[in-house]
Amino acid sequence: SSSPMHELNQGVTVVTGGAGLIGSAVIWGINNQNQENIWLVDECEDDSLKKRNLEHLCFRRILGLGEFRHLVSQNSPELSEIRTIIHLGACSSTTETDEDYLHDNNFLYTKELCEWSLCNGVRFVYASSAATYGDGTLGMDDKDEEIEKFQPLNLYGWSKHKFDLLARKEGWLDQITGLKYFNVYGPNEEHKGDMRSVVSKAYEQIAETGRMTLFRSHRHDYRDGEQK
């Protein structure tokens, strides 16, 4: 079969969360394949750190989250040229406690885009998360029959896991592509504040103080700071 990058030659590619760490890198990668027929979906305030992530990217259109969801809910003719959705937009805070917000922004939003994509013959790639695996003791095997046993440790993980479970129940998993990211770091994450990667925070700490703070250990066989 043809590669995903080859398929991006056709029609519009939508990247949700396109101004974020991963989304901006994905658009940069697509641009490097000489493709610019991209719609970027994100919330970007003028003069924000997020807006800076867009400076060197090429895309045809930028839409806010609410605007895009509305077009999808109406099955608007405006969307007829879309051939691929790369859905990376979500609340990625592992400490978020507003369950209703996570349910709407992470679960329902993904469900809406997936259903629309399947109804319209659009390729759908979405970000799940390694947070769905919980503490790892139940394995990390994403075979269909294994997915249900996972026990995420936080509401963010559950918001992602709920969609994976729905996709399995509805028989969507062989028609869509889910990506489970572990720790991601690199350029364009400054806007994430306290949710930046360990690498980003450590670099800043070392540059300022010559030292870095490590996480406390939650396992008896590793002392604090000795995790590897």
Give a label for each model feature.
Residues T94-Y109, D144-P152:
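Short alpha-helical oligomerization interface
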Residues L138, L165-K228:
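NAD(P)-dependent short-chain dehydrogenase/reductase
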Residues L65-G66, H70-N105:
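NAD(P)H-binding glycine-rich loop region in Rossmannoid oxidoreductase-like domains
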Residues Y101-H103, P152-H161, K192-S200:
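Short-chain dehydrogenase/reductase
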Residues L40-F68:
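Glycine-rich phosphate-binding loop and adjoining beta1-alpha1-beta2 segment
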Residues T84-H87, E112-L155:
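Conserved Rossmann-fold NAD(P)-dependent oxidoreductase catalytic core, especially the SDR/UDP-sugar
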Residues N105-T110, V125, S159-K160:
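Short alpha-helix in the Rossmann-fold core of NAD(P)-dependent oxidoreductases
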Residues T13-Q33:
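N-terminal Rossmann NAD(P)H-binding glycine-rich loop of SDR-like oxidoreductase domains
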